[in-house]
UniProtKB/Swiss-Prot annotation:
It holds the Pfam family Trypsin_2. Its EC number is 3.4.21.-. GO terms for molecular function: 5'-3' RNA polymerase activity; serine-type endopeptidase activity; serine-type exopeptidase activity. Gene3D superfamilies: Trypsin-like serine proteases. The active site is at 461 (charge relay system), 489 (charge relay system), 551 (charge relay system). GO terms for cellular component: host cell membrane; membrane. It catalyses: RNA(n) + a ribonucleoside 5'-triphosphate = RNA(n+1) + diphosphate. It comes from Human astrovirus-5 (HAstV-5). SUPFAM superfamilies: Trypsin-like serine proteases. This is Non-structural polyprotein 1A. Belongs to the astroviridae polyprotein 1A family. Cleaved by the viral and host proteases. The protease is probably autocatalytically cleaved. The modification O-(5'-phospho-RNA)-tyrosine is found at residue 693. Residues 805-814 have a biased composition (Polar residues).
């Protein structure tokens, strides 16, 4: 195809026709076969470039031309390829702006087509799912049985109609309507007005004469009950007339019959009960007794009411005998059913006998109806024990809940205002970390623990005497070892290596005990409570109810920092023991030398006491006896007394806290500032430069000689004590503060107030070395060398003028000796990085005296940073600073503090005041 037709990979490529046509003509079938995988249906740019511009070429082939093709890929990038005769080689891409614009449009079109394809597939899938759901819906509808319409039998409709007809018959109080004319109405109105006027005049006369009798009061009450105050032309009169005409029972039975036919599940039984109640004359008195009946006793009652309609004496006799016969013949039933049947028969007997008595005496059963309702209300009121009672159906299901608390139907906002109160503040949020809690499981019981550092902290009484405990965290069980238990009720458990908690709790740097938060796991549920706390020595008290499993829970502040460990609950208040950073590390056992010193002191005290008291005192050694543990009344009384003592102490502390603002304390003045001698103000000033120190080391001076030279330099440079400014006045300074623990006086020193420069200590001049004959080499004998030094010192020419004695040898120490409490805190990565300076910043003295210890500490720091375990770091730094103190150098922790780079977890600065000279 050389010099043939131009090659085009696709129609878009032909349409755009980018690049050189000659290059397209150079395309061969081999080149076409090995073309890179460009975007389908996309244009390419063909270039015909000199070979030497692409490949390193020499000779005649430099000016040969090669085909270079540039195109886009599926991932949105593009590249250029040159054909070297065998294959296409990728070269640095050549920029063609037209090609890049075209490729962007093509990629965008391809992306839209892909999105369209995916949308169409998703639409087809959703359409198919909808069709499946429609078919499933139709199938499920066919399986559901359709409820048939309620059908009421005709016989019950007829019975309801009969009862309705009976209820519409006028009652016994109905009167026949007479023919009235306008004249009779006028006469009746005048008569009523005259009677009313007469009654009013009589009432006013009695009121004026104060002649009101009891009968008058009863008449007034009767008129109120009869609504005599309602005018005759009012619509209420018409309502009362029809109620009086048809009677209340007839209207109620009419409504109840219609409701029974429409809604009742047993319309036959209900309608027959209404009919027998109406025929017997008991009427409303029957309804309150219905809940006491069963199905059998209900039909017994209906039978007796029908019998009462025909023969009342026979019905009363059968009703009285019914409970007795039921007790005898129904004894085969179970207890619950037996009691229900007897209760229904007794209710039937009471209804028949009481109804007959009421009908005989008053002609109505209203009084019996009121008595039965009163008994039911009294029975219900006697069982209102809780805050509410539940009404259940026959199956035991709660159908209603009625509160027993009396509540106002109106004006209840007064009660709500009194109960809720007016908000006067806003409660703050507290930080909790449930991921830092775990459950401690021991054979004696369970408790709560929390993660802090590399330990699990809990209460000591939760661990007990166990060496190993089980730690439950997020449903998994781990076995852990008890590391340390201090004197407090706290235990520290080593966190297992395969246990990785999601959160850890830190100790509070600035404890705030005003408001505490207790969180723990109780029955696998997280419980949180917030309360105000008070401090009582090393314990806290707060009003929180303790449940089983809360011992060892963390007591935190509002920021989630640990303040104490929950331990006990006696009565109303809960208690916790305050936790300090010093509790995390065990107290080091005294060394053998210290033990021997204590033993010597104890023996000396015994000797002194024996010398003072010659009489021999025989002390009986306590014998270990094993007694069976028992609890008697005295032990219980002691426990109660202990609990009451703690509660009273807490109560006193709370009262004192409340009364603290009212107690005033007189302030006195103690002057400690004016005229006070300020000694050791030049502490920390370098007495030797690096050059001087290096020269002394090169001369090979030993330690004693080196310290003697430093003593002479101090004698030359030190001046008189510095005084405060005379203008400064401290109102709390009365001159007695000159003598204190921080001021050391030399009572043999004579202060010259003429401020003459003191004479430095005399210097001893060394004699010039004289040549001596060479001696044979002898073994090194330190004793002989020491004797020679003494003889050499005796040969020194002493001045004839009397001078002060030479200063005694001394050793220089920088500040106070390091104490372990200053190093015992939570170290982290920042503390480890800043504790040692960079190697170029170390002094020569540090490298010579502390070189090996510094290298060891650097190794410990690197290991701690890699493993994130800083437990060994405090002890290593303490040993290094202790060695520096013994060598007269400044401690590294003090150096960090002096540069304002104290560790962020640093417990407190050491109260150092610079170099201090100690005379041995």
């Amino acid at each position: 195809m050389a010099h043939g037709e131009p090659y085009y990979s696709s129609k878009p490529d032909k349409d755009f026709n980018f690049g050189s046509t000659m290059a397209r003509r150079q395309m061969t079938p081999t080149m076409v076969t090995k073309l890179p995988k460009f975007v389908r249906n996309s244009p390419q740019v063909y270039d015909w470039i000199v070979r030497g511009l692409i490949f390193p070429t020499t000779g005649k082939t430099y000016f040969q031309r090669v085909v270079v093709i540039t195109g886009g890929f599926e991932d949105g990038t593009y590249g250029s390829f040159a054909f070297d005769g065998r294959e296409w080689v990728e070269i640095y891409p050549i920029e063609h702006l037209n090609l890049m614009s075209s490729l962007k449009l093509i990629h965008k079109a391809n992306a839209l087509q892909e999105r369209l394809r995916l949308s169409q597939e998703e639409k087809a899938t959703l359409t198919l799912d909808v069709q499946f759901l429609q078919h499933e819906n139709v199938r499920l509808k066919e399986l559901i049985s359709k409820p048939e319409p309620r059908k009421i039998q005709m016989k019950w409709i007829i019975v309801g109609a009969v009862l309705t007809f009976l209820s519409l018959i006028p009652g016994g109080y109905a009167q026949s309507q007479t023919n009235n004319t306008i004249f009779t109405d006028v006469i009746a109105a005048c008569k009523y007005s005259t009677e009313t006027l007469t009654e009013n005049l009589d009432l006013r006369i009695k009121l004026a004469l104060a002649n009101i009798t009891i009968s008058d009061k009863l008449d007034a009450v009767r008129q109120i009950l009869n609504f005599a105050f309602v005018p005759r032309s009012h619509w209420l009169r018409t309502v009362f007339y029809y109620i009086h005409y048809y009677e209340m029972w007839n209207i109620f039975m009419f409504v109840l019959a219609i409701g029974t036919v429409m809604r009742s599940t047993r319309p036959g039984t209900d309608l027959i009960t209404l009919a027998t109640s109406h025929l017997s004359g008991f009427r409303m008195a029957v309804l309150p007794t219905i809940p006491f009946h069963t199905t059998m006793t209900l039909w017994v009652m209906n039978t007796l009411m029908v019998c009462y309609y025909f023969d009342n004496l026979l019905a009363i006799t059968m009703a009285i005998l019914a409970p007795i016969l039921g007790i005898i013949f129904l004894c085969f039933m179970e207890d619950s059913n037996y009691v229900s049947q007897i209760r229904g028969l007794i209710a039937t007997a009471v209804l028949i006998a009481g109804g007959h008595a009421c009908l005989t005496l008053t002609g109505t059963t209203t009084s019996l109806f009121v008595v039965i309702l009163t008994c039911r209300f009294v029975r219900m009121a006697t069982i209102f024990i809780g805050t509410r009672f539940e009404i259940r159906d026959a199956n035991g299901k709660v159908v209603a809940t009625v509160p027993t608390r009396i509540k106002n139907a109106a004006f209840d906002f007064f009660q709500r205002l009194k109960q809720s109160g007016v908000r006067v503040g806003v409660n703050e949020f507290v930080v909790i970390k449930p991921g830092a809690l775990c459950v401690i499981d021991t054979p004696e019981g369970k408790g709560t623990g929390f993660f802090s550092g590399n330990d699990i902290v809990t209460a000591a009484h939760v661990v007990g005497n166990n060496t190993f405990v089980n730690v439950c965290y997020e449903g998994l069980m781990y076995e852990a070892k008890v590391r340390y238990m201090p004197e407090k009720d706290i235990a520290f458990i080593t966190c297992p290596g395969d246990l990785h908690p999601t959160a850890r709790l830190k100790l509070s740097k600035n404890p705030d005990y005003s408001c505490v938060t207790v969180m723990a796991y109780v029955n696998e549920d997280l419980v949180v409570s917030t309360a105000a706390a008070m401090v009582h020595g090393n314990t806290l008290s707060y009003a929180v109810r303790t449940q089983d499993g809360m011992s060892g829970a963390p007591v935190c502040d509002k920021y989630g920092r640990v303040l104490a460990v929950h331990q006990t609950n006696t009565g109303y208040t809960g208690g916790a023991v305050i936790i300090d950073p010093a509790d995390f590390h065990p107290v080091k056992a005294p060394s053998q030398v210290e033990l021997l010193k204590e033993e010597i002191e104890r023996l000396k005290a015994q000797l002194n006491s024996a010398a003072e008291n010659p009489s021999t005192v025989i002390t009986q050694q306590p014998t270990a006896t094993l007694e069976q543990k028992s609890v008697n009344d005295s032990d219980v009384v002691d426990l109660v007394r202990t609990a009451m003592e703690r509660e009273m102490k807490i109560l006193r502390d709370e009262i004192n806290g409340i009364l603290a603002p009212f107690l005033q304390k007189k302030k006195g003045k103690t002057k400690h500032g004016r005229g006070r001698v300020r000694r050791n103000l030049r502490k920390g000033v370098k007495l030797l430069t690096e050059e001087e120190y290096r020269e002394l080391l090169e001369k090979g001076l030993d330690r004693e000689t080196f310290l003697d030279l430093i003593d002479r330099i101090i004698g030359e440079r030190s001046g008189y004590p510095d005084y405060d400014d005379e203008d400064y006045y401290d109102e709390d300074d009365d001159g007695w503060g000159m003598v204190g623990d921080d001021v050391e006086f030399d009572y043999t020193e004579v202060i010259n107030f003429d401020q003459a420069k003191p004479t430095p200590a005399p210097r001893t001049t060394k004699p010039k070395p004289c040549p001596e004959p060479e001696a044979e080499t002898q073994p090194l004998d330190l004793s002989q060398k020491k004797d020679k030094q003494l003889e050499h010192e005796q040969q020194v020419v002493k001045p004839t003028k009397p001078q002060k004695n030479d200063p005694q040898p001394y050793s220089q120490t920088y500040g106070k000796a390091p104490i372990w409490e200053s190093y015992d805190f939570d170290w982290d990565e920042d503390d480890a990085k800043f504790i040692l300076p960079a190697p170029p910043r170390l002094t020569k003295a540090d490298e010579i005296v502390l070189g090996s210890k510094i290298v060891k500490l650097r190794t410990i720091i690197e290991t701690a940073i890699k493993t994130q375990n800083y437990s060994a770091l405090p002890e290593a730094v303490f040993e290094l600073d202790k060695a520096a103190y013994e060598a007269g150098l400044e401690g590294f922790l003090q150096r960090v503090k002096s540069k304002n780079k104290a560790p962020k977890n640093y417990k407190g600065p050491q109260k150092t005041k610079g170099p201090k000279t100690i005379i041995h």
